[in-house]
Amino acid sequence: MNQLKNDRYLKALLREPVDMTPVWMMRQAGRYLPEYKATRAEAGDFMALCRNADLACEVTLQPLRRYALDAAILFSDILTVPDAMGLGLSFGAGEGPKFARPIENKAQVDNLPIPDPESELQYVMNAVRTIRRELKGEVPLIGFSGSPWTLATYMVEGGSSKAFTKIKKMMYADPQILHALLDKLADSVILYLNAQIKAGAQAVMVFDTWGGVLAHNEYKAFSLRYMHKIVDGLIRENEGRKVPVTLFTKGGGLWLEAIAETGCDAVGLDWTIDIADARRRVGHKVALQGNMDPSVLYAQPERIEQEVKQILAGFGQGSGHVFNLGHGIHQDVPEQSPKVFVDAVHEYSKQYHK
């Protein structure tokens, strides 16, 4: 594998000294880029794009051609794992994901296979290998998965949800069924992420998009417990380097201390948290990723720069901060905004790393 030319993202995750704060954007390969829309049209549909290693590689690299990003993230979807379990995933035009066979009972959970990453999910590993080759060591490649809880919400609800009534009914009325599902998902995610690491991912991230809808104790019992299991099961060193792991719960500011206790290297922050407060609470144990509100990118360049400066000042001196948005970039942001954002992070962060 190629020698890494820019490793400040990996170093910051391990709280090692860097020359400036590294930055990437959640959903940086995506619909806000006209070239992404063209490639997706060429693929035919979203899952066809995910399954074509060359096209998945192309959209992964597109934002790196425009912006001085410090990491690439695999272009894929969190629902690849439940799809490989045979639930019949589809994406309707202009609609969110739908599962033809949602999980309703114990028998269905018992019959769910644990997917083999190098067979049912081989297309993801092929994409990782292709992207890693084409990156030529410019920046590291991030692999990722959804968290067991977040994957389970889609599998039980049958798609996206606002109220999460079906999965919460299962959680309170039949908790043993949900625990069995989450346990199987955790085992599947461990295999999946370890396969991504073996294929060339140099860091991994677990997206717990819906952990924040849970009550205080239920978050720990039904979400964090299974992310902890994943952290314990991951390959943490490959190609002679540590492979850092980041856990991100949207709405997880209440539980930063508990998340930091899992043994992860970094905790992702959404925009509702004051990064100075987060660093005071857990900065001695983990790196922090975040946490600008993605909607700031609608603002004028001066306002974007002001927000970047504020977050950098909030984190303060030294390494241990990966700058990012607090969630995925919106698809209709002005074309120049991401460049203003990325360049501002690099320019204004140097003073914090002297």
From Swiss-Prot:
Residues engaged in binding substrate: R27, Q28, A29, G30, R31, D77, Y154, T209, H327
Instruction: Supply the alphabetized keyword list.
Output: Cytoplasm, Decarboxylase, Lyase, Porphyrin biosynthesis
Pathway per the UniProt entry: Porphyrin-containing compound metabolism; protoporphyrin-IX biosynthesis; coproporphyrinogen-III from 5-aminolevulinate: step 4/4
Q: What is its EC number?
A: 4.1.1.37
Classify the main location: cytoplasm
Q: Which domain of life is it from?
A: Bacteria
Q: Which CDD domains did the record assign?
A: URO-D
Among InterPro entries, the record links this protein to: UROD/MetE-like_sf, Uroporphyrinogen_deCO2ase_HemE, Uroporphyrinogen_deCOase
One molecular function GO term is: uroporphyrinogen decarboxylase activity
The UniProt entry's coiled-coil ranges are none
Q: Where is this site: Transition state stabilizer?
A: D77
Q: Mind telling me which Gene3D superfamilies this protein's record contains?
A: 3.20.20.210
Assigned protein family:
Belongs to the uroporphyrinogen decarboxylase family.
HAMAP family (alphabetical): URO_D
Q: What does this protein do?
A: Catalyzes the decarboxylation of four acetate groups of uroporphyrinogen-III to yield coproporphyrinogen-III.
Describe its assembly.
Answer: Homodimer.
What is the recorded name of this protein? Uroporphyrinogen decarboxylase
